[in-house]
Amino acid sequence: MYKLTDLYKQLKEESTEAPQSQYKIYCDMDGVLVDFDKGYQELTGKPTHHADVQGKNEFWGTFKQSLQDKKISEKDYWANLQWMPDGKELWDHIKQYKPTLLSAPSRDPQSRWGKRIWVKKHIPNTPLILAAAEAKKNYANKNAILIDDRISNINDWNAAGGIGILHTSTATTLDKLSKYGI
């Protein structure tokens, strides 16, 4: 026969609420969950590192011209990007902590719609904040973790008092998160 305390314990174990954590997780999209580099290379025929050589204006100019040549809207480009090869694994681990996506839109406002569509298709009901890269740091605090693939965003986040985790692979990110009990 069940005691009331046994039933309470069982119900508590079955709870679907997020595990208690003292940390708020913010996760970037491009280069962490979403494979922007692969999408860019498939679209333009050029690797994304050419931005470092040619400059951002030519990088985005090539992007826009390729979209026009292939008759693809910027909204559709962003909405149809693929997961990073290990992006789902990372998401499956952090989703229980109710993370917020913190992503920088491109120069074209249509990227905002495309990113929202991607989230709705792949991870519905996930909060999404679209902020310029230099504004991400405004969400930092001592209990806020940012997972991002850009060192400049991590440095800004850390300088603003947050905990930045430079994402190079899911394995290394999960290892770093484990140090915070996540």
Question: What is the meaning of each model-derived region?
Answer:
Residues 1-25, 32, 48-50, 58, ...:
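Charge-dense, intrinsically disordered terminal/linker segments
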Residues 102-145, 151-155:
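Substrate-recognition "cap/lid" segment bordering the active-site pocket of phosphatases
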Residues 33, 37, 84-87, 111-116, ...:
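A structural signal for well-ordered alpha-helical scaffolds and beta->alpha junctions
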